Regions:
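Conserved HGGG/HGGXW glycine-rich cap/lid loop of the alpha/beta-hydrolase fold
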Residues: 6-59
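Gly/Ala-rich beta-loop-alpha elbow adjacent to hydrolase catalytic centers
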Residues: 88-96
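Conserved alpha/beta-hydrolase "acid-adjacent" motif
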Residues: 212-218
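Catalytic active-site module of serine/aspartate enzymes centered on a nucleophile-bearing elbow/loop
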Residues: 228-258
Length: 258
């Protein structure tokens, strides 16, 4: 598998497809480059998936997990493979925001799925420390089981979601993710949201109602900030999952400029 060096960090990269457009995919907190792997073969061109520092198969420095650090990882991978499009999920969307805040013309097309942060710190970041504590205190498999137990009610309503979450946790680097959690939840994606008004690239925003970590209201705020944006808002997690085929097609057409 290809790797990209970014300072003292080695970033794991996986490639799907070939040709244009070249799109870099930035995953969410605790996940890896495999997060969107089931969907990238359906997209045209080249999909460049990578693991952020501390995640998946990339190296895990002792510190340096703020959004500007993650944006640096994103930029290094995008430049290495000539990516002019970017797709980001949650934390990955925050890394895109951080990067275009400094370089508004960095990407030609941008997709943000379930954005989670802007220029206001998370409320009660200590609530995430419990996950970091578990990852640092128990063997990986036991830590994952204990973390999944905290979502017992959610899994009772939709048991299949547990298997999905378990799959997403499998490539996790426990110590690296714990370090990332402690830093990134105390940071902001961008110093001033008004900087996003300078971004002229088309932006596709995908959000859902009822998600406290990825509030739909943030999607509406971003829709107002970006000069050329589309907003898709789903009513629930169930509707989001059911809409995946439609969303994949929507993203495919958007990235191709159709």
């Amino acid at each position: 598998m290809p790797e990209v060096r970014n300072g003292d960090v080695t970033l794991h990269v996986e490639i799907d497809g070939d040709g244009d457009p070249v799109t870099v995919f930035a995953h969410g907190l605790t996940n890896s480059c495999r997060e969107l792997a089931p969907f990238t073969p359906s997209l045209a061109g080249t999909a460049v998936r990578f693991c952020f520092r501390g995640h998946g198969h990339s190296s895990a420095p002792d510190q340096g997990y703020r959004f500007e650090d993650l944006a640096s990882d994103l930029d290094a991978v995008a430049r290495a493979f000539g990516a002019r499009n970017a797709v980001g999920t949650s934390m990955g969307a925050g890394a895109i925001m951080s990067l275009v805040g400094h370089d508004p013309a960095r990407f030609d097309r941008i997709v943000m799925l379930l954005p989670a942060s802007l220029d206001v710190p998370f409320r009660n970041p200590e609530r995430f420390d419990g996950i970091a504590d578990l990852l640092e205190s128990y063997p990986k498999d036991e830590a994952i089981e204990r973390i999944l137990e905290t979502s017992h009610e959610r899994y009772e309503a939709a048991p299949w979601l547990r298997e999905l979450d378990l799959l997403l946790w499998q490539d996790m680097n426990p110590l690296g993710v714990a370090r990332a959690i402690r830093e990134v939840v105390r940071d902001v994606s961008i110093s001033d949201r008004e900087l996003l008004r300078k971004v002229e690239a088309p932006v596709l925003l995908i959000c859902r109602e009822g998600d406290t970590l990825h509030p739909a209201e943030l999607g509406r705020i971003l829709h107002d900030l970006f000069a050329n944006s589309e907003l898709v808002t789903l009513a629930s997690e169930e509707e989001l999952i059911a809409s995946i085929p439609m969303l994949v097609e929507r993203v495919r057409a958007f990235l191709e400029g159709a």
